Each structure stands twice: as structure tokens, then as C-alpha cells.
Amino acid sequence: MVDQLSPSAISWERGKTKSQIAIGVSKMPTEILASVSPSCNGESETHMVELPLITPNDCTLLLIDQQAGLAFGVESVARQTLLGNVVALAKTATLFELPIIASTSASTVYSGPVMPAIQAAIGDVKAVERRNMNLWEDETARAAVVATGRKRLLVSGLLTEACVSFPVLSAIEEGYDVSIVADACGGLTPESHSLALRRMEAAGATMTSWIQVLLELQRDWTRHETYAGARGIVEAHAGGYGIGLSYARDMIHPPQP
């Protein structure tokens, strides 16, 4: 397989006992990573493993306690910025048809329902109400995750120190591959938010952002079935990057009269 690729498609890091060759595979059905290491006779051996990139077919989005009553306590990030990030993530999951599990706690006595802007982005998805701070210890909520049949989780929620970190640690212990969408999570203080992220990362979670999730799922701007939707999300929520895309569309390639 490697011999069939052009040199420009392969990059390696020399000088190490074991190096990884990243292979451009935009035209292939699955992404692969070739790991090259010397064998006992001095010759290189090539092992093929999957790249750790998410696809629309292998991950589930968990939206945990995205409720106004809990957002009031967030001090790790500007609340409006956080809300915009979560909405962008929710729109992305909807566009790429990911299973979405929303869960709430104390919705009728304090926290309120899923925030309206987020609910609008996920359509008719109904939140699973629970009492336990750890979603993984709630039978109904955990069953909803298991029922998707997917072992890769994207997690966004409030608060990072508890209702995000507890189920993440539990899911990792059960063998799930968990990515924390860190800019779509909020904590009580910048320090406690950061410490919670560090604890989850130490346990094996991967840190990511909503824009990386979108770009990782899209990957190729010639994927026309999601191009317009992905571009619309970027233009609405990705700051200067979105402004640049809008400019390119309107000025460099203006619509024909």
C-alpha cells in the first residue's frame, strides 16, 4: 500500500526507533496509519492501524446538563461564548447525523430544561432526566448511550468538575474512547475547570474543540452532501475563519447575476 503512494503523501519523523508514517487517504474508504519499526533482522516491518480520527459512523455526542441554572455558575469562560460553542457543536452533530444523547438534572426544581438555543439545534431529541451527578450511574441514561452501539463518545457539559468528569472517567474504565469538547464545557472557576480536564486526560480522554470536531467529520470540502451545512456553521460560529469563508464566497467568487 505504501509503495503505491506518492512521496508527497508520506511524511516521516526520522531518527527514532519507531516512527509513524501519515498517509493521505482522502480517496480511501477508511483512514489508516502505517507504523514502521525495525525487525530483529534489521529490516523494516509495516503495521497498519486505524487513524484516531472520528467519523460520522463511529461516535455519539453526549450533551450533559446544558441548562441555564447550571450555566449561571460557570466562570471558566464567558457564558455567551460557551453557549455559542455548544450550539455550534450541536448543529455539527445534527448535520452529520450523529446519535445525540442529552441528559438533564434537577430540571423542574432548579436547573431548568436544556437551554433553548441548544434544544433548537438538536431538534426533537428529548433529554433523559436523572438524579445522579454521574450519568454513567443512571440506568436509563447509560442504557441510552450503550444502545447506540458506538464506543467513541464526544462529551460536552456542565459542570466540568462533576457532571462531565464523572461519566467520562466511568466510560473510560469500561473501554470507551472519549473525547472532551473542552470549549463546549464550563466549570466553576478557570482553575477547577482546567484541573478536571487534566484529570480526564490523565485517565485517557482526548481533548478537542467544536471546530476540530466539525473539520474532522467533514475532512474533505468536496463532500457535497454536508458542504453547505458545514460551511454555514463555520460562517456563523467560527469567528475570523467564518468571516474569511464568507469573504471568499462573496468577493473572490461572487454569485453570478
Task: Enumerate the language-model features and the residues they cover.
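Low-acidity, Ser/Thr- and Arg-rich intrinsically disordered low-complexity segments
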Residues: 6-19, 26, 35-39
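Active-site acidic carboxylates
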Residues: 36-132, 194-201, 206, 218-257
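Glycine-rich phosphate-binding loop at the start of an alpha helix
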Residues: 87, 139, 161-165
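Short, surface-exposed connector motifs at secondary-structure boundaries
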Residues: 94-101, 123-126, 147-153, 176-181
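Distinct, well-ordered alpha-helical segments
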Residues: 111-118, 141-142, 167-169
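Glycine-rich oxoanion-binding loops at beta->alpha junctions
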Residues: 127-146
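A contiguous pocket-lining binding segment that forms or flanks enzyme active sites
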Residues: 152-210
